[in-house]
């Protein structure tokens, strides 16, 4: 499983996320994470031609993605990286303020539950969840926190 912390480290998590994008039809998939990435760990073009920018947060249970991290990504994902769809994927969860900020800014949150569903093929890809999705969108779950 993509969220198996014993099988993956942070670099492998970024690669596994990129592999899911490839599996689900994205093109030009690139792992760009590392020092100086300005929040973009994976970039791709969705099957319908939109630019996808993903930040991967490889966190342990109980270590949630916070508002400050979300705001840093929010400051670069659309302006610097020119994302049509911005996504934060985590092996954990999001704090309420982080999820609220993401919703206000149009950033898609993929927590450990959604990650398992996406990885297992039982849930949608992140680009089908966002406010700019071309299909019917899924509202922000209230159980993220």
Residue ranges with predicted function:
Residues 1-38, 43-145:
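Mixed-charge (Asp/Glu-Lys/Arg
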